[in-house]
Amino acid sequence: MAEQKKVVLAYSGGLDTSVAIKWLQEQGYDVVACCLDVGEGKDLAFVQQKALEVGAVNSYVIDAKEEFAREYALISMQAHTMYEGKYPLVSALSRPLIAKKLVEVAEKENAVAVAHGCTGKGNDQVRFEVSIKSLNPDLEVIAPVREWQWSREEEIEYAASRGIPIPINLDSPYSIDQNLWGRANECGILEDPWAAPPEGAYDLTASLENTPDVPEIIEIAFEAGVPVSIDGVTYPLADLILKLNETAGKHGIGRIDHVENRLVGIKSREVYECPGAMTLITAHKELEDLTLVKEVAHFKPAIEQKLSEIIYNGLWFSPLKDALLAFLKETQKHVTGVVRVKLFKGHAIVEGRKSEYSLYDEKLATYTKDDAFDHHAAIGFIELWGLPTKVNSIVKKKEQIEA
């Protein structure tokens, strides 16, 4: 008897991907489940076992927290990637890593296809499929949820008829995605852009009414653009981000309410919580202000915006992203130092920064008797700097006289 074809499924443990296991089996595939730990806090042993109980022939759980932190979230922090000026790319960052691991498992298992649980109207289907095809063009990509187009009731009926456990939180109105870089929430009342997000939509952050009335001061140390310690205590990067999620989250930092333009052409209202990400981006930017020369500091935002768009639009494995990262890496060589941040009532306020590579010279900046700036040099500088506009004005006046 011929061996059945294998498909590797990105498995979350939820209803959609559990139903997908059975559905793919009925299409003639042996299903290999693959679940990544990118810091969402799931019971992964439970998820791994559930996949096997539903019918997967094998079930992988991969601890990818540190890889996600160092190879993906770190880039977001160093590039200050804020899609449309607001969103630090929480879900968009994890998709290429998940795709990479799916392809690795597929190649190990000699699978012919990879499957995901995305719908047909979201960004993630694009991110997954473009990434998978970039890494292995020979793999087929299957999107069961997009293909079957069932209502929720039809999906539950299918699950019940095949003995698939129905999650107890199925009546939650929200669709949530979480990793160590933050938490994304949509659907339910959030689909009304006029409706205020209920407090139940949040999990990582406290409401301003419930935040401490006393500020908390922390010091974050960076080495070559990488955050390495908080208040002198060194952490692996993934743990440092998770620690900041907890610390900044209790002060209500990192809540983002965003009506964004999706890649597929529609607008979507999303509520994000990114306490660690927003605190780190704020602190890192201040250290760059201290250590980057003016020309680099002024040009870098153009690179940041392009990187934000590329990552959001699912082009992580593109030549342009690689080229932009080469520039980014060069800018981080001297971003070393300590930033002091006050966490209070939803704000991460930088109160101090220092670096051995600081380009700030107090003797040049001061207005005291210690001033070392050559004020007389300004006369010639101003004359030369304004010369083009001066000449332009002379020519225009001459034209007016002749007219």
Curated annotation (Swiss-Prot):
InterPro entries: Arginosuc_syn_C, Arginosuc_syn_N, Arginosuc_synth, Arginosuc_synth_CS, Arginosuc_synth_type_1_subfam, AS_cat/multimer_dom_body, Rossmann-like_a/b/a_fold. GO terms for cellular component: cytoplasm. Its EC number is 6.3.4.5. It catalyses: L-citrulline + L-aspartate + ATP = 2-(N(omega)-L-arginino)succinate + AMP + diphosphate + H(+). GO terms for molecular function: argininosuccinate synthase activity; ATP binding. It comes from the Bacteria. It is an enzyme of class 6 (ligase). HAMAP family: Arg_succ_synth_type1 (MF_00005). Belongs to the argininosuccinate synthase family. Type 1 subfamily. This is Argininosuccinate synthase. The gene is argG.
